[in-house]
Every structure is written in structure tokens, then in C-alpha cells.
From Swiss-Prot:
This is UPF0058 protein AF_0738. It holds the Pfam family UPF0058. It comes from Archaeoglobus fulgidus (strain ATCC 49558 / DSM 4304 / JCM 9628 / NBRC 100126 / VC-16). Belongs to the UPF0058 family. InterPro entries: UPF0058, UPF0058_sf. Signal peptide: none annotated.
Length: 93
């Protein structure tokens, strides 16, 4: 992958992280990522650093899914509120 594609993937996973945090679901799952200090806006960072950040984001997201079923996450009122505010079409029956 090119660096631009890596950064786009990093940004996508970062947005998922923020979604979980805003819903109150992430409880320390992204501590290692936060400590790394590499965010998608840090375009001057190396491709390797962005790959490490992606790996840590994936780890945090997978830990959330390991602890909670997708059904539990979907039924979470906090997450539902966040999803409705950013993508209401996903919540329509």
C-alpha cells in the first residue's frame, strides 16, 4: 500500500475509535494507541509508524468485539445515539 492509503485506513480506524469512545464503550482499549502518539493528521510520520498505529487500533477494536457481541453493541443506547447522529440511514428499520 502507498503511504496515502495507509493514512486513509488509519483515519478510518481512528474514526471507529472515536465512535466507540463517544458512545462510552471504549474503556482503556486504546491506551497503547494513545501512548504511541501517532494520529492520522501526522502525515510527516513514517509509513511504519502509521502501520503500528493501525495495528494498535485494530487490537483495541477487536478487544471490544471480544468482550461484547455485535448485537450488544448495536443495542447499546449510547452507540445507537452516536450512529443516528452521524449516519441515520443505518438505524432505519
Amino acid at each position: 500500500m502507498h503511504k496515502e492509503e495507509i493514512i486513509l485506513l488509519h483515519l478510518t480506524l481512528y474514526n471507529i475509535k472515536k465512535l466507540f469512545e463517544n458512545a462510552g464503550i471504549a474503556n482503556g482499549h486504546f491506551k497503547a494507541y494513545d501512548e504511541l502518539g501517532v494520529q492520522p493528521v501526522h502525515i510527516h510520520k513514517s509509513k511504519t509508524e502509521h502501520k503500528k498505529a493501525i495495528s494498535l487500533l485494530c487490537k483495541g477494536i477487536s478487544e471490544i468485539f471480544r468482550e461484547r457481541s455485535p448485537e450488544d453493541l448495536i443495542e447499546s443506547e449510547n452507540l445507537k445515539f452516536v450512529i443516528e447522529s452521524i449516519a441515520p440511514e443505518l438505524c432505519e428499520p
